[in-house]
Amino acid sequence: MVKSLQLAHQLKDKKILLIGGGEVGLTRLYKLIPTGCKLTLVSPDLHKSIIPKFGKFIQNEDQPDYREDAKRFINPNWDPTKNEIYEYIRSDFKDEYLDLEDENDAWYIIMTCIPDHPESARIYHLCKERFGKQQLVNVADKPDLCDFYFGANLEIGDRLQILISTNGLSPRFGALVRDEIRNLFTQMGDLALEDAVVKLGELRRGIRLLAPDDKDVKYRMDWARRCTDLFGIQHCHNIDVKRLLDLFKVMFQEQNCSLQFPPRERLLSEYCSS
């Protein structure tokens, strides 16, 4: 079996085209909008939750160009941090909607969430013909017409995300697995996982400053991996970043890139915050 590559895409300010504003389109918006992407939504009708949640500008009668019969709405105050749609086109899809004003710009992802499967397939092949095979396209409920799949996401705080994917075979089962993982974390008690991620990020940034040369990349990675393993899930949230950076400096400079850490018991007693 050929496997999928699971990646965490950075979509901030990237142009996304979503065709279809129904129930499935709404689920896509919940995942896409928080990424700060510049999303254009094409649909003649919208799910009742879309405007109040992601597109209040669409029915803002205070806008100078507001009209009841308007076909195109651009968010005048769009910002990647505001969790809003950038543009709404009140219409069925037309081929011309693939055009972008800036010829140097491009759609990062194109998705269809419409019940017309033949039209969805046509749009898929049109995108490939116009933009090349590398264009990322996703057709809802058609795994063969998907360059990527939406999995079941488990978010712990703002920074720790876990993706469960069945590679398009059974999204619901993926969601059940996600829920089981959530329950396991709940049973394990308060591990302060987001705090752990933040502190480990600070630690990695610090060791990059202490060992900035490219030739030191492998040592930095090996040191960070070994350090994380020694503290484990239960204790990473409590690490003392400053003390560990001092330890790194000694092991890197004075001990000639040593990976021989102090015993775990000593680490937990001397390199955790009081």
Swiss-Prot record:
UniProt similarity note: Belongs to the precorrin-2 dehydrogenase / sirohydrochlorin ferrochelatase family. MET8 subfamily.
MF term (GO), any: sirohydrochlorin ferrochelatase activity
Keyword Lyase: yes
Active site: 141
Record: residues binding NAD(+): 23-24, 43-45, 93
UniProtKB keywords: Lyase, Multifunctional enzyme, NAD, Oxidoreductase, Porphyrin biosynthesis
Subunit annotation: Homodimer.
Protein purpose: Catalyzes the conversion of precorrin-2 into siroheme. This reaction consist of the NAD-dependent oxidation of precorrin-2 into sirohydrochlorin and its subsequent ferrochelation into siroheme.
Known pathway: Porphyrin-containing compound metabolism; siroheme biosynthesis; siroheme from sirohydrochlorin: step 1/1; Porphyrin-containing compound metabolism; siroheme biosynthesis; sirohydrochlorin from precorrin-2: step 1/1
Keyword field contains Manganese: no
Protein name, as recorded: Siroheme biosynthesis protein MET8
Top-level taxon of the source organism: Eukaryota
Reaction(s) the record says it catalyses: precorrin-2 + NAD(+) = sirohydrochlorin + NADH + 2 H(+); siroheme + 2 H(+) = sirohydrochlorin + Fe(2+)
A Pfam family recorded for this sequence: Sirohm_synth_M
Effect of residue 237 to A: No effect on dehydrogenase or chelatase activity
UniProt-listed Enzyme Commission number(s): 1.3.1.76, 4.99.1.4
GO annotation terms (biological process): siroheme biosynthetic process; sulfate assimilation
Gene: MET8
